[in-house]
Amino acid sequence: MRLNLSGHLSDHITFCYTGGQRLERDRPTALFIHGAGHDHSVWMLQTRYFAHHGWNVIAPDLPGHGRSSGPALKSIEDLAHWIITLAHKLGTERPVVIGHSMGALIALQVAATAPELVSQLALVGVVAPMPVAPALLDATLSNRDKAHALINQWSFAPHSQIGASGVPGINLTALNERLMERQAPGVLHTDMAACNAYRAGFDAAAQVRCPTLLLSSAQDRMTPPKALAPLATAFNTDFQPTRVVLPDAGHAMMSESPGQVLDALWAFISSQPTGQAPA
């Protein structure tokens, strides 16, 4: 699905993946937000499952990413306002908002800025603040190949880096490298700089007014579970998040452990009174 968010920060064509299904007003909606240097395809298994089990799915390519035109937006706050505009444009009512990495920061800021919009929140592979190593941030400007290699080194568990994959015949690190290569020059740096500069995470968490899942992975070296504690404690006492840690994946958990990620999201959403899990 393509649409134009006319008059907003990005007056360009936006591509949204819907899992191969039409949006229906009588269905609950899940809005998936990808991370830095990626596009909607990182959510392929999860979005298709939701779309074929009674849910509307909206998985946009952020501005300047994938099939969406325009420049990449430079701050998490601008990206959050863009997501809010997209949700209103599509007429979605209180979607579940799910984000990974940079997308999780965006989702968090969306829930803080427009708490009336979000029914449930799932933050996958997140910490706040989310500092980016200077060597990686420099490489995103000066040497894209090096940046991609560093990201693969830090994003995947050791067994994935030597060829293990839940999908036979798929090289996960090569697939991730090709995905990053498809983004326009400068997009990865803009994304990483936005993550590095975002300092509003604790304030945002305190403003969240919906059930929240913090989904981590034990072998994640970019957003390790132990670094999540400060953000987890920043949530309002009436809205303490549910924490789940997957045992066998790294930061790229949607591709390393796609079924486990889906199971964790589905179980959390189904357990909440606002979730409309199908029979």
Language-model features: where?
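Active-site glycine-rich loops that stabilize anionic/oxyanionic intermediates
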Residues: 35-38, 101
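Conserved alpha/beta-hydrolase catalytic His-Asp/Glu region
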Residues: 138-209
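Short alpha-helix in the alpha/beta-hydrolase fold that links the catalytic acid
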Residues: 210, 224-233
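Catalytic histidine neighborhood in serine/cysteine hydrolases
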Residues: 233-251
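Short beta-strand/loop motif that positions the catalytic acidic residue
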Residues: 208, 214-216, 220
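Active-site loop/oxyanion-hole signature of alpha/beta-hydrolase fold enzymes
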Residues: 2, 9-20, 44-52, 56-102, ...
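Catalytic histidine-centered segment of alpha/beta-hydrolase-like enzymes
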Residues: 249-262
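Flexible "cap/lid" loop of the alpha/beta hydrolase fold
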Residues: 105-150
